[in-house]
């Protein structure tokens, strides 16, 4: 209360939100200090007014929905390696070089453009298996379709939404609280699904994405 109208409160909040101390990261410390309704959980982030809240604070790049509990299935690296071997001829035909980090969505779209008709259905199935290994709780069909159709921006957004919804479906959390330290003043958003976020006129940041790779990081 008073953050937007009281310069002193805004300065105090901005200073506290940068502190990581006592086993709490940036944002967690500030919330714990400023509200009695915020408690640190034994495992996970915070309990706010009785709700389990996952806190994501971004002070450089965008927050990632990946941790020790939420990661691709163990068969994902093998599926990725098989894809690179199976479609080596088509990948080479695009003239693109696959870096050590893996294949980006726009590269997948380029490969789809040169895919022989007799391989189209199998290619789609293989991509679906790879995406499903990354997001085991989600229906990945629309993201795969967008990538195959060359709609790279749409595919990235769908991938980002899958990342959030997969994360929330696995974690024991009621919502995610995002704190963006890159804006002045800082901005906050709380949501329980990607639909909530988009419904509020916000969107997920979808930067460089490597669906076909061997390292989840």
Where in this protein do the model-derived segments appear?
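Nucleic-acid endonuclease domains
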Residues: 1-44, 51, 56-217
């Amino acid at each position: 209360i008073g953050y937007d109208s009281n310069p002193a409160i805004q300065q105090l909040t901005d200073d506290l939100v940068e502190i990581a101390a006592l086993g709490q990261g940036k944002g967690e410390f500030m919330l714990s200090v400023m509200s009695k309704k915020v408690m640190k959980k034994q495992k996970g982030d915070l309990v706010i007014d009785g709700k389990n809240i996952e806190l994501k604070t971004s002070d450089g790049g965008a927050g990632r929905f990946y941790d020790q509990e939420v990661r691709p299935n163990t068969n994902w690296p093998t599926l990725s390696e098989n894809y690179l071997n199976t479609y080596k001829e088509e990948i080479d035909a695009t003239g693109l070089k696959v870096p050590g980090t893996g294949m980006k969505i726009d590269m997948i779209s380029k490969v789809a453009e040169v895919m022989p008709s007799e391989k189209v259905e199998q290619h789609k199935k293989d991509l679906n298996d790879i995406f499903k290994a990354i997001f085991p709780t989600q229906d990945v069909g629309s993201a795969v379709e967008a990538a195959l159709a060359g709609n790279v921006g749409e595919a990235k957004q769908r991938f980002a939404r899958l990342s959030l919804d997969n994360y929330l479906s696995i974690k024991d959390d009621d919502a995610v609280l995002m704190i963006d330290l890159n804006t002045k003043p800082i901005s906050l958003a709380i949501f329980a699904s990607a639909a909530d976020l988009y419904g509020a006129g916000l969107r997920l940041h979808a930067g460089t994405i490597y669906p076909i790779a061997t390292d989840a990081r």
